[in-house]
Amino acid sequence: MTAALLSAFCMSAAGCSLYPGNKETQPANASQAETETKDETKQQPTGETEEETEKPTDAHPEDIEPFPHGEKETKAEPMKNGKRIVLMTDIHYLADSLTDKGEEFQYMVEHGDGKLTNYVWEITDAAFEQVEALSPDVIILSGDLTLNGEKESHKELAKKLEQVEKDGIQVVVIPGNHDINNRNAASFDGRSRQMAEAVSANEFAEIYNDFGYDEALSRDPASLSYTYDLGPDMRLLMLDSCQYSPTNKVGGMIKTETYDWIDDQLDEAWDDGVILLPVAHHNLLDESKIYVEDCTIEHSEELVNRLEEENVPLFLSGHLHVQHYMRNEEDRGIYEIVTSSLSTPPCQYGVLEYRDDESFSYHTQQVDMEKWARRHKSTDENLLNFNTYAPAALRTIFYNQSYDAMKDSEEEETGDLFVKLTQRQKEQMSEVYAQLNAACYGGKAYEVVKEATTTPAYKMWQEYCYP
């Protein structure tokens, strides 16, 4: 990893709060967004009312609020005058049969991007169990369902979704950039990894046929986009923003032919008098100030213009792995809510309550892994103490990410940037990088950014990365 890439990582970590843009992008609590939008023109409802290191440091656990122990499970009443929607994204599920949980697998987790793939099975099961008590109208999985598009991972996750629907909750899915034609699909065995079978776009739709595609009101012939009715008053516009033909790419794009289909769906929603809620994997707005090319849908202004012309108030996405929320333009324009990765601490999902008058509220809910572990009589200390383990693990992963880049840098590549740093300076810089990145992923950079950016280590980032 080059110094340039590391500097981008650092700015990404700080970017949640250091690049605030207008005030709309940074609510007082980035994990919760509430707004009301009542437009009298289009989008009229029909209802009655209106986020191998050589020498890692000890991670410092963050405060992640645990759920009350021993709390009796109570099921919420179904929402009246609107829809309650659970948003899960970037699960990055890996079939249990594809790993022996050995050395190569553990290294992938500890030197990765923050996903706790070593507990993805338990996190997924716990999340599905927990949301049942919310009585949601639907669970939306907005892409990156699998680690790297392994066919076995898709099939195993689909079996779990079958059980969710048997329990009475509808599930709809769209692909993410990791899910289709991914050359990185692999299994893990000891110190090595081997190529695993991936899936094509047609195979993806077949595997998840029961989770949106078979029940679609309309399917786009040019992509895996479709519409899905949530009762008589609301319709989901599930947009395939991924590029996987002829090869898989990270960035997002809506095909030209798909825009014609989108126009038809906007017109039909208006004619039918239903609220249209668009969902995609990639971001509609420039949520990331560093990774615009990889995160924001290419030429997204075309999609923004179409949606705003029809007064569509809200867009939902994932991909960023970071909890974020912003509005296009300061006092008007579409809102976007980006839900963070389920498998990345704080391991949370979004709960959207969208009322018939087109007002909506959104909050994140942490998966209570400790309660789940006790209920299932787990003896795994990490699960039983997940609220301590998870933030510490995340900090260690981000520390490794930073330290590895500096450790591996060479003078001819970096031009003296890192090679002249002392061991202690590298450690200090990695510590502050880990602190900022971990907070940012949970949508809580605002809690630590003021203190972190006054440290000597942060000033070293400024001196050595941005001279």
Feature map (PLM): residue ranges:
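Active-site-proximal beta-strand elements of phosphoester/diester hydrolases
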Residues: 82-95, 233-244, 279, 335-340, ...
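C-terminal motif of bacterial Sec signal peptides marking the signal peptidase cleavage site
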Residues: 13-15
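His/acidic metal-ligating clusters that form di-metal
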Residues: 131-138, 170, 235-237, 249-335, ...
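Non-catalytic terminal accessory segments
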Residues: 3, 17-81, 374-467
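Acidic/histidine-rich helix-loop elements
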Residues: 92-123, 187-192, 245-256, 287-290, ...
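Extended active-site neighborhood of metal-dependent phosphoesterases/phosphodiesterases
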Residues: 63-77, 156-260, 332, 351, ...
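Active-site environment of divalent metal-dependent phosphoester hydrolases
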Residues: 94-97, 147-149, 177-185, 244-247, ...
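N-terminal active-site segment of His-dependent metallophosphoesterases
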Residues: 54-151
